[in-house]
Structures are given as structure tokens and as C-alpha cells.
Amino acid sequence: MKLQLIAVGHKMPDWINAGYADYVRRMPGDLQLALTEIKPGHRVAGADGARARQLEAARILAAITPGAVRVVLDERGTQATTRELAGWLENWMGEGLTPAFVIGGADGLDDSVKAGAGKLFGLSRLTLPHALARVILAEQLYRAACIIKGHPYHRD
């Protein structure tokens, strides 16, 4: 199963890239986590970021695999345990669906990205830096995969 991660931002710090790469490398062989980095929209000084979010939205929507379940990360989204996340993955696998996880940039996400989401998912009630959210999501997807596979990484 392919897991798609679409994230606004590029030129991440080395420690972000290393953390993300570590969980991708550890992912079980039948699960692949593929990252698509979206170039941030140009933000005009003094503007509210709406135009930048619209540009990013067009790039995000173009990057999503056709037919994928769009899972948009949002601080107001559904909170879930890792076991619940594993259940979502199992259901999507059983239905032959590709989940496309979307992480917005510094200005958040345009409503058009959220509107078509199959699920709004909150990693935390805390507001997380978008770069760090990549690493946390990769770890949680790895942990969920371990639950599905019966690997002892996750302990209740």
C-alpha cells in the first residue's frame, strides 16, 4: 500500500529530513510512504496569506493521487489514538484506497483543500510547526503499521 504525504514547504532543516527518512526506512516493505513537497506560495508583506494558500491549494490538489482518500491535518480535526489510526489504515487497505495525508504550510490550508477531505485529522490539540508535523506523522504511521503487523514497537 502506498501512503502519500503532501506537505507544503521545502528546504527543511537536516534534522527534520533525517527524522522523516528514518521512519520511511523502517516502514514495513508492503507499505511505502512517499513525500511530495509543495513549494510555498509567495506571500506579500502585509497580506493575510490568502493568495499564498490558494496557490498552495492548486499545487496540493494536483499532487494527490486520483481516487485517494484525502486526510487533511488540521488542529481542529478528529483526534485519534494510534490504534484508531491503525484501524483507519487497515480499512483503507481493505478497500484498496490510497490515503493522501496533507500538511499545510505556515499560513495553514485553503478551505478548498479541507472541503474535499475524507477526514480532517488532528495530530494534537497543540499547534505544531508544519516541519515537525511531518516527522510526527511519519512516526505515527510507522507505529500504526507496526500495530497492524503485530510488531512490538508499539506498547500499550
Swiss-Prot record:
Specifically methylates the pseudouridine at position 1915 (m3Psi1915) in 23S rRNA. S-adenosyl-L-methionine binds at L73, G104, L123, S124, R125, L126, T127, L128. Homodimer. It catalyses: pseudouridine(1915) in 23S rRNA + S-adenosyl-L-methionine = N(3)-methylpseudouridine(1915) in 23S rRNA + S-adenosyl-L-homocysteine + H(+). Its EC number is 2.1.1.177. Keywords: Cytoplasm, Methyltransferase, rRNA processing, S-adenosyl-L-methionine, Transferase. It is an enzyme of class 2 (transferase). Belongs to the RNA methyltransferase RlmH family. This is Ribosomal RNA large subunit methyltransferase H. The keyword rRNA processing applies. It holds the Pfam family SPOUT_MTase. One of its GO terms (cellular component) is cytoplasm. It is found in: Cytoplasm. Coiled coil: none annotated.
